[in-house]
Amino acid sequence: MGQSQPIGPLPVLIIEDQPVLRIEVADMVERAGFIPVEATSVDEAISILETRTDIRIVYIDLDMPRGVKGIEIAAAIRDRWPPIEIILTAATFAKADLDLPVRAEFYSKPIHHGDVIAAMRRMAADTDRRGCDRPA
């Protein structure tokens, strides 16, 4: 009988334009056993997703001030890379006001690290079970 090999720590793409918040989230992600991959803009995030086919979880700040809004990038990620799991956060939006992409989870800021880490672990387990290969 074949057994699947453990995949090791998964990378989590963090899309956050505020340096202090990005560092805080990266630390949280790393402490939870994931590998933080940081993007400061939507353009940088798309470039990373086009080259890093190992990314299965994306953490997005919806309060991005320039260009494409966080909810729009979340929808674009869902359309282009359906297997990717999405965590959305915001200080200025309420969940009821958002049209969330399928399977996306929303957390109001300030986030509770334990809740977000639990969501990441659940998402990682779900992608592991589904065997989520995705094209670049």
Which residue stretches match the model-derived regions?
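Two-component/phosphorelay signaling modules centered on CheY-like receiver
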Residues: 19-37
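Conserved phosphotransfer microenvironments
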Residues: 61-75
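Acidic, metal-coordinating helix/loop segments flanking the phosphotransfer/catalytic sites
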Residues: 38-57
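Non-catalytic signal-transmission and effector/linker regions of two-component phosphorelay proteins
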Residues: 1-13, 19-20, 26, 43-44, ...
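Hydrophobic beta-strand core positions in alpha/beta domains
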Residues: 59, 87-88
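Conserved phosphotransfer active-site motifs of two-component signaling proteins
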Residues: 91-95
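Conserved acidic carboxylate
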Residues: 16, 90
